[in-house]
Swiss-Prot record:
Any Pfam family the entry gives: DCD
Enzyme Commission number(s): 3.5.4.30
Name of the protein described by the UniProt record: dCTP deaminase, dUMP-forming
Pathway annotation from the record: Pyrimidine metabolism; dUMP biosynthesis; dUMP from dCTP: step 1/1
Length: 190
């Protein structure tokens, strides 16, 4: 069941759902708008011949922070990682779905490639997978509305929420745009 604005406010007031910093004006009829943080991860495409999800490639991306009052310019065809300004904390009976803002989609900005789902129990800044599919550069301003977080109530609390030792949560507590840790999904045969 998708939470309404009144349910979202009630969950935040009760301290079960965390959206920090919280601004009540960002609550929409069935979502909470989230804003763009000021940190980005750009790909160093001259260091590798290819991306291998099975390999740890620590210098595949570099952290970039635009100067105060300046935007990050995302060029056509580019892909970077960003993050929400808000730290989001979900209880064990709520899951989240990050959606883009339609006004930005109409300009050619995609806010996530595949990872729009947030598990119950997650706590951290949500990493954004930003792509420009337009034919002109798009300026991304820290603090701008970048997406909307929809919240869904589970039929029962998760037995092993995200962050539990049994589920191998790789991104719990993340701050800023966090690079892929897909290599942790591969078993090493030494």
């Amino acid at each position: 069941m998708l939470l309404s604005d009144r349910d979202i406010r009630a969950e935040i007031t009760a301290g079960r759902l965390g959206v920090d910093p919280f601004d009540d004006s960002l609550v929409q009829p069935s979502s909470v708008d989230v804003r763009l943080d000021n940190l980005f991860r750009v790909f160093n495409n001259t260091r590798y011949t290819h991306i291998d999800p099975a390999q740890r490639q620590d210098d595949l991306t570099s952290l970039v922070e635009p100067k105060e009052g300046e935007p990050f310019v995302l060029h056509p065809g580019e892909f970077v990682l960003g993050a929400t300004l808000e730290r989001c904390t979900l209880p064990d009976d709520l899951a989240g779905r990050l959606e883009g803002k339609s006004s930005l989609g109409r300009l050619g900005l995609l806010t996530h490639s595949t990872a729009g789902f947030i598990d119950p129990g997650f706590s951290g800044h949500i990493t954004l997978e930003l792509s420009n599919v337009a034919n002109l550069p798009i300026t991304l301003w820290p603090g701008m509305k970048i997406g909307q977080l929809c919240l869904l109530r589970l039929t029962s609390p998760a037995e092993h929420p995200y962050g539990s030792s049994s589920v191998g949560s790789k991104y719990q507590g993340q701050r800023g745009p966090t690079p892929s840790r897909s290599y942790q999904n591969f078993v090493k045969n030494d």
